[in-house]
Amino acid sequence: MEKRKSLFQLAVPIFIETLLFMLLGIADIFMLSQFDDRAAGAVGASNQVIGNLNLIFAIISAGTAVLVAQNVGAKNKREIERVCSISLVMNFVIGLLVSITMIFFGDVILTKMGVTRSLMGYASNYIKIVGGALFVQSILNTVTVIIRSHGYTRESMLITVGMNILNIFGDAVFIFGLFGAPVLGVKGVAIATTVSRILATIIAFIFLFKGLVPVSMFKYLYDKPVGTFKKLIKIGFPSAMENMSYSLAQTVIMSIILLNLGEQAYIARTYIWTLSWFVVLFSISIGQANQIMIGQLTGAGKVEEAYHTGLNNFKTAMLFSVLGGIALIIFRRKLIGIYTDNQDIILIGSITLIVDAFLEPGRTFNIVLINGLRGAGDVIFPVVMAIISMWGLGVTTAYYFGVVLGLGLPGIWMGLILDEWFRGVCMLFRWRGKKWVRKVMV
């Protein structure tokens, strides 16, 4: 019972935090759409660039999460301080370089993306303000990862809740001119986003230095930092590559749908992706909690406990995934009907949701078990399998089933199922084989 309680103590705040980020994005776009449709489109395009840049920060953050969790388990305070100080400074420097790039070359990047002239004015304002302050986001990402890896997911969630409430309030003030404020539109949204992130970063630092690590930890920047830097990259780079591979594969599949199946299939895909995300949230939350638990247990040398904890967490996530899949099947037409009354889209979407119910358990395999392997420091095997399976199996069979065999969007989903289940079974064999035991870095 204690293990399960520990899982939910970690996973529930992560679930709420991730859900709030999702809802914040929806609220931003909704309020901007009331101001100007072009403003909503411009922010969407800018956020695509910013989202890709956040993957750069994820390299250091992923390494930080694993090393901090393992050293918390090992009770190695000196190494925790060393990792924290080096990762914070590294992501700050990287974030500063990215921010400068956005200020001076943001417009160029947007133009290369194909952002039209009518959207450019809004997009330019947004990317220069939010993109120009990305160094704040890079620091915030690192601090919250450190807090989470100590097991304080509730505190991380509360920081995020406060940031999101302030962000939405600021959006409303500057979009609708509340309390006599000027109507700034996109520029106001950008200011609200940046200010909320700055305040969240300050609060996160206060919690970090008050209860977890001392300010004096920065002395380790001068004490042989190269070894720690190498460890951060050794774990972080493969983890980021895996996410990049997935993102790129999904982009290619989106293009296959647009070019071969038409607009209605693409619209249906967008709605299905949004609906399935609510099921995936459970796996993501449990997966991230699993990484923290495995990191701390392996760091403490409790390998057998880590092994069984990983399997138990996987079974819990699988239960939620199966139940979520059943709900998608039962309510498929009503769920798609929330978004559209177009009967063709509802038909395509409802059929594909039936197929998606079989995809979600496969996705759970990968999300939970890969996070477990990552927590133990085993990061090369997942990224190698990701590249082989996503491209050799997922993309190719999605095209074959969906386009060549003429099965349409459900055929695309069948290809995704093959990828997720093949990789997932490989991850399960990897976990059961315990080769990850040799990858622990403390």
Predicted feature locations:
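Hydrophobic alpha-helical segments typical of transmembrane helices
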Residues: K3, F15, A27-M31, A39, ...
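Small-residue-rich hydrophobic transmembrane alpha-helices
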Residues: A40-I100, Q137-S156, M254, L258, ...
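Helix-terminus/linker motif at the lipid-water interface of multi-pass membrane proteins
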Residues: L23-G41, L110-R117, V173-L184, M244-F278, ...
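Transmembrane helical elements of multi-pass membrane transporters/channels
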Residues: Q9-G25, I129, M163, S196-A200, ...
